[in-house]
A protein has these predicted regions:
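Short, surface-exposed interaction loops/tails
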Residues: 26-51, 118-177
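Surface-exposed patches in mature extracellular/periplasmic domains of secreted proteins
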Residues: 56-67, 104-109, 114-117
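Internal low-complexity, small-residue/proline-rich segments
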Residues: 80-113, 125
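Bacterial N-terminal signal peptides
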Residues: 8-20
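N-terminal secretory signal peptides that target proteins for export/translocation
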Residues: 1-5
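Structured segments of extracytoplasmic/periplasmic soluble domains
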Residues: 46-56, 95, 99, 103-104, ...
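Conserved hydrophobic/amphipathic alpha-helical signal-anchor segments
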Residues: 26-93
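Sec/Tat signal peptide C-region and signal peptidase I cleavage site
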Residues: 21-25
Length: 177
């Protein structure tokens, strides 16, 4: 009886130790999850570079009114990327590389091109920068987005970033709600 209890405790402890490893192995086995993680990382890196460029090159030239409007816009629950002009990867690289980032990736984790947007002409524009991935299916859903997370296993969701934050991002729903 004691041996059986000890064996049960040992097996229970081992399963608790191996469970996170099995979860990581399952994660590694999912090419879509890896592609999504790489895409989020790329967007975060390029977005951070764009943000540093903005802080150094654009923000000092903005009017107080433009700063106030941008602050108000940052609290919006919806955004429309059409308000920011598209810029080519090459033109963006000419602005950011090598000072702010080593390179601008051409494609997301699924091999689809990123879309880059940057307003280089009007320092008083309310929205200045954006970039996005179309997700696994390679098709952008729209330019208008509600600011919120999406189920991380929905790999076809667009992943847009704008003016310093993710507009849509993969995140598991909170439990208990």
């Amino acid at each position: 009886m004691i041996v059986r209890i000890q064996r049960t405790l040992l097996l229970g402890t081992l399963s608790l130790l191996l469970l996170p490893t099995a979860s990581r192995a399952q994660e590694a086995a999912s090419p879509d999850l890896l592609a999504q993680k790489r895409t989020v990382s790329d967007i975060r890196n390029v977005g951070t570079a764009m943000w540093h460029w903005y802080k150094e090159e654009v923000a000092p030239k903005r009017s107080k009114k433009a700063h106030e409007q941008a602050e108000k816009e940052s609290k919006a629950t919806t955004v429309d990327l059409q308000r920011v002009p598209v810029i080519s990867r090459e033109d963006l690289a000419a602005i950011l590389v090598p000072r702010y980032v080593a390179a601008i990736p051409a494609a997301d984790g699924w091999g689809h091109p990123y879309e880059f947007r940057l307003n280089t002409k009007d320092p008083n524009a309310i929205l200045v920068m954006a970039l996005r991935s179309a997700g696994r299916d390679g098709k952008f859903s729209d330019t208008h987005y509600e600011v919120k997370a999406f189920e991380p296993t929905d790999f076809d969701q667009d992943i847009p970033w704008m003016d310093g934050y993710f507009v849509r991002w993969p995140q598991k729903p909170e439990s208990g709600r």
